[in-house]
Amino acid sequence: MDMDSILLDAEERMEKALGSLDREFAKLRTGRASTSLVDNIKVDYYGTPTPISQLASVSVPDSRTLTIQPWDRSAFQLVEKAIMKSDLGLNPVNDGKIIRISIPPLTEERRKDLVKVARKYTEEAKVAVRNVRRDANDALKKLEKGKEISEDDVRKSTDDVQKLTDRFVAKSDEKCTAKEKEIMEL
C-alpha cells in the first residue's frame, strides 16, 4: 500500500462510519411519520423473520400517519402483532384492508431520551472515525519502518489523515445537531 491508497481507504471507511450514523438516525423516532420507523420490525411469516417492507407496502399519507398494506391477507394479524411487540410504542389499527398507525406526539421526556440516544450514536461514529485514523497512521508508520517513504512524507500524510478525521468528526457533529433539532421540534 502506498500513501495515497492509505488516505483513500481511510476516507472510504470514514464515509462508511457516517453512513452507519445516518442509518441509526433514520431508525430514531421523531414526531413525524417515516417508513424507516418499521424497517427493523420483523414479522414471523411462515416461521421466518421477515421485514415488513418485504410483506407489504408502507406509505406515509401525512406527517402523523403510517399506512401498511400487506399483500397477503393472512399477514394482517402477523404484521399488527409484530408492530405491537416492537418497542416503538405504536398502536396499529387494522380495518381489514389496511393497517393505520397514528404517530403520537413525543413527550418532552421521550424527546430528551432520544437526544441522548442520538448523541450516543454520534459518539460511536466519532470513535469509528478515530479508529480509522489510528489504522491509517499505523499503516504509514509501517511504510516508514520499511523505508518505503520518508519521515517528512509520514508527517505530511499524518497531517492529511488528521484533517480528514477533523472533517468527518465535524460532519458527524453537524448531523447530530440537525437530528437533535428535528427531535425537539414540536
Curated annotation (Swiss-Prot):
GO BP annotations, alphabetical order: cytoplasmic translational termination
A Pfam match: RRF
UniProt key word Protein transport: no
Localization per Swiss-Prot or TrEMBL: Cytoplasm
One Gene Ontology cellular component: cytosol
GO molecular function terms listed in the Swiss-Prot or TrEMBL record: ribosomal large subunit binding
Keyword annotations of the record: Cytoplasm, Protein biosynthesis
Family statement: Belongs to the RRF family.
PANTHER family documented for this protein: MITOCHONDRIAL RIBOSOME RECYCLING FACTOR PSEUDO 1, RIBOSOME RECYCLING FACTOR
Function: Responsible for the release of ribosomes from messenger RNA at the termination of protein biosynthesis. May increase the efficiency of translation by recycling ribosomes from one round of translation to another.
Protein known as: Ribosome-recycling factor
Biological source species: Nitratidesulfovibrio vulgaris (strain DSM 19637 / Miyazaki F) (Desulfovibrio vulgaris)
